[in-house]
Amino acid sequence: MNYKIKDMEMEGNWVLCDPIARYSNTTHQRVRELGLFDNIRPEIEVNDIKVVELFAGVGGFRIGLERASKHFKTIWSNQWEPSTKHQDASIIYCRHFGAEGHSNEDIATVPTEEIPDSDLLCGGFPCQDYSVATTLQRSGGIEGKKGVLWWQIYRILKEKGDKRPDYLMLENVDRLLNSPAKQRGRDFAIILSSLSSLGYIVEWRVINAADYGMPQRRRRTYMVAYHKGTQLAAQFEKLSNKFDWILQEGIMPQAFNCQEKDGKTNSFDISDDIAEVSDNFNKGKKESPFKNSGVMANGKVYTLDTLPKYDGPYLTLGDILVDEMVVPEEFFISEEDLQKWEYQKGSKSLKRINKTTGFEYNYSEGAMAFPDYLDRASRTIITGEGGAGPSRFKHIIKTESGRYRRLVPIELERLNMFPDNHTFGSSDLRRAFLMGNALVTGIVENIALVLKERM
């Protein structure tokens, strides 16, 4: 991989940077040759891998897959945001990839027969009820407003029958392994039980992108599944020590090298009765049985905690910044507002009252870095990153001239390893929201590189 950072060039009023070249040998021209910005559905060749992308957002999975290989061809995609009339993500997706084969409607209303058969189904199914910005106690898990979309994945796979895809690549928040608070690990157990009943072997790993040299500290649960009839499944079945698959032989360890954390392993069975799992899995226990890495086959779970093992180069927040001269004035913090930002970022202890019970309690929080460090990966981008109002969670940097400012949309895109101005056309506030919902495309690219070689 080529991590050399290219110099920025000026073209008219735009600042152009080639973030793709930081993570691979691909250039903008080469990306266009691979069809990343084509406006027609790609022609399918003999060795191509037909992809269906659900909950596509602005196309993070597609970008990662197509950077990994030109043979990943997305033939159908779906993106629908029920909470807004203006479908920003879908509009951006179509602008880059074309409207043909794209569905902008509630996936629950799309008949399975209208979704073409594919080799790989991918998607980051949204469970924002228990995202990083929400406390686990308030989480609805799969029962939550958006979490029920998991059942649309299950419905599509089940109704496809013998024509269901051989491979799955899925993404969710890291807390999925521990939710809900009242029944730790139940939601993830439901997912594994569902996929086991359909004949899939499932690998998972909680990955922090910054641990592998990427410029954002973003922890997410990634899953790769392969059907029992595949070559990968046959290789897994032959392995006597299944924990070797987690540490060395599987897709995840070959995409992201790791080592055992403490040598403590766990193995147990999950029922293929989804209702039984929903009602009784891990009931009454305080901790989830799932560790940050694992594999499940035939209802048998093997899991352990791993640590990243990486000695390559690291990108930092400072590496992805645009020149101060091209930052719009509204992104700079005025002297009169600076004190408000310092307060938000500082430590505090406050008395609060529960609106439901009237119970008074002390709420405290520690200080955060102010400004954000430029010599390390950024903090996690959240959906509330945009807007001028002071916030504890938004990024603030100090420029070379000594001024303080927020991050501009291009910088947020770079932190997720998207092409510059990928979300151009939406408001700055909305662009920040979209990047707060997106994944780090470099994670998908690395997984896809290994998956392609072992299919």
Locate predicted features.
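Short, flexible loop/turn elements at secondary-structure junctions
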Residues: F55, E81-T84, I107, D174, ...
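Core alpha/beta nucleotide-donor-binding catalytic domains of modification enzymes
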Residues: G12-R164, V173-F188
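C-terminal target-recognition/interaction regions appended to catalytic cores
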Residues: N2-Q29, I49, S293-M455
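Short aromatic/basic micro-patch
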Residues: G124, Y167, R406-P409
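Short, solvent-exposed loop/turn segments at secondary-structure junctions
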Residues: G59, P126-Y130, D174-R175, A210-G213, ...
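Short clusters of hydrophobic/aromatic residues that line enzyme substrate/ligand-binding pockets
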Residues: V110, Y130, M214, H395-I397, ...
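Class I S-adenosyl-L-methionine
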Residues: T112-S118, Y130-M368
